Amino acid sequence: MVKILLKLLLALLMLGLLQGCGSLFYWPEEGLRGTPDQLGIEYQPVNLKTSNNLNLHAWWFPSRAEEPAKPQGLIYYLHGNAENISTHFMGMTWITNHGWEVFILDYRGYGLSEGKPSIAGVHHDAYMGLKWAIAKAKEQQLPLVVLGQSIGGATAVTLVANARAEEQQQISGLVVDSAFSGYRRIAREKLNESWLTWAFQYPLSWTITDRYSPEKHIKNLPANLPLLFLHSCTDSVIPCSHSQRIYQQAAEPKTYLEAVEGRHIEMLSQLKWRRELVVWLEGL
């Protein structure tokens, strides 16, 4: 019976992996649980279109700071792999009180965005969002910072590293919060956690593309781009060794902040680390 279950599990895993790994890395939630205006937060919906005509849904949040009158800059926020912007936006809109605008995109299949997520598709969506953010920041003559959390952080590294030279010049900083260093590496670690799948960790992980992994692109980031890495060493979802790995490979100027407690992507929910981020942004 155990052998039959193992064979069935292996077949299901192989099927999921060979179909683009979307079900393994992406857990979208369709629709929205609510909108910012229900909480009294000003925002504007933004609609983008992919090269294959998918409609993507996003939100832009203006600065809420009274002084200075002009915003400090624009943060392009790439969220994690689960749910959608209606559950993620509060994780970054606090910074609008410090004078920053925030732009947050839902990848294909998330929220009101059309399509089905895949590694390649999500990276394409992130690039569509980057082009919008660059145009918005340029229009207002504001610095642009790209900030990604979890899989959004992994996406952000590869996104910025592969943007065109003129686009890279418009980016003033990159923040990577609790990201993994490689798709294949994190898949192997997760397969290793269960006795049902540990024996298949290597053969199955090799079916996953590493083309978009941060560790393969970190050295291609623009020269002198300020980098900030954050990770909790008690993160049970993505070990902090992943952030340490890409941090070590990155060029200066770079900063690494590590918490000694807290769960996955919880650092920026704490006042201490929010202050650290604001100080870092002020130094750009």
Task: Pin down the residues of each PLM region.
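An N-terminal hydrophobic leader/cap segment in hydrolases
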Residues: 16-49, 56-59, 63
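Membrane-embedded segments
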Residues: 51-133, 142, 154
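Alpha/beta-hydrolase fold nucleophile elbow
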Residues: 139-150
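Short beta-strand immediately N-terminal to the catalytic nucleophile in serine-hydrolase-like folds
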Residues: 146-148, 177, 230
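Glycine-rich nucleophile elbow surrounding the catalytic serine of serine-hydrolase chemistry
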Residues: 148-158
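Hydrolase active-site cap/lid region
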Residues: 158-217, 266, 271
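Short beta-strand/loop motif that positions the catalytic acidic residue
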Residues: 221-223, 228-235
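C-terminal catalytic histidine-bearing segment of alpha/beta-hydrolase fold enzymes
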Residues: 241-284
